[in-house]
Curated annotation (Swiss-Prot):
Pfam families: Ribosomal_S16
Keywords on record: Ribonucleoprotein, Ribosomal protein
Protein name in the entry: Small ribosomal subunit protein bS16
Region (Disordered) residue spans: 150-181
GO biological process annotation, one example: translation
SUPFAM superfamilies registered for this protein in UniProt: Ribosomal protein S16
Organism whose genome encodes this protein: Bacteroides fragilis (strain YCH46)
GO cellular component term of the entry, any: cytoplasm
Highest taxon of source: Bacteria
Low complexity composition bias: residue spans: 158-181
Stored InterPro entries: Ribosomal_bS16 (IPR000307), Ribosomal_bS16_dom_sf (IPR023803)
Family of this protein: Belongs to the bacterial ribosomal protein bS16 family.
Keyword Lyase: no
């Protein structure tokens, strides 16, 4: 039986997530499978992978062929690194303890790189939000200034309209007083 490690699609239209399965290469994509070893969700940033590492390593060691995407996932998760180190142990190049130490060092290095990337993304997001807030404050200041100028112009026009009316009113009073005398 030609065994493949591949993705099995789930989810709704335009929002797929996948199960990582072991299946016969002749079985259809979403058909019968031997074992489910994990899930892969490409919709998150970065993509979320939940993988049973031991079972994935077992199937790679017994010769299951992964699809291209699954090969990238397994490589990123360290399955191929572990296989490489176990091959070195089998050849006698180094001991199993040294292989474990190398694998842990590789894993820690990978995790630190991912955490640095995540921190950088968070920092960029905060900087963008701060810049957006500053731009909004400037726009609001301009709007407030324009509104204040408009109100001042309305007040000036209102005062100018009232001033001639007040001057005309005393003139009429004096005219009526003079006529009364």
């Amino acid at each position: 039986m030609a065994t493949r490690i591949r993705l099995q699609r789930h989810g709704r239209k335009s929002y797929a997530f996948y199960s990582i399965v072991i299946a016969d290469s002749r079985a259809p994509r979403d058909g019968k499978f031997t074992e489910k070893i994990g899930t892969y969700n490409p919709n998150t940033n970065p993509a979320t992978v939940d993988l049973n590492f031991e079972r994935a390593l077992h199937w790679v060691l017994v010769g299951a062929q992964p699809s291209d995407t699954v090969r990238n996932i397994l490589s990123r998760e360290g399955v191929y690194m572990k296989k490489h180190l176990l091959g070195g142990v089998a050849k006698g190049a180094f001991g199993e303890a040294e292989a474990e130490a190398k694998f842990e060092a590789w894993k820690n290095n990978k995790q630190s790189g991912l955490s640095a990337l995540k921190a950088k993304e968070e920092e960029a997001k905060k900087a963008e939000a701060k810049a957006r807030l500053e731009a909004e404050k400037k726009v609001n200041e301009v709007k407030a200034k324009a509104l204040a100028e408009k109100k001042a112009a309305e007040e000036a026009a209102k005062a100018a309209a009232e001033a001639p009316a007040e001057e005309a009113a005393p003139a009429e009073e004096t005219a009526t007083e003079a006529a009364a005398e």
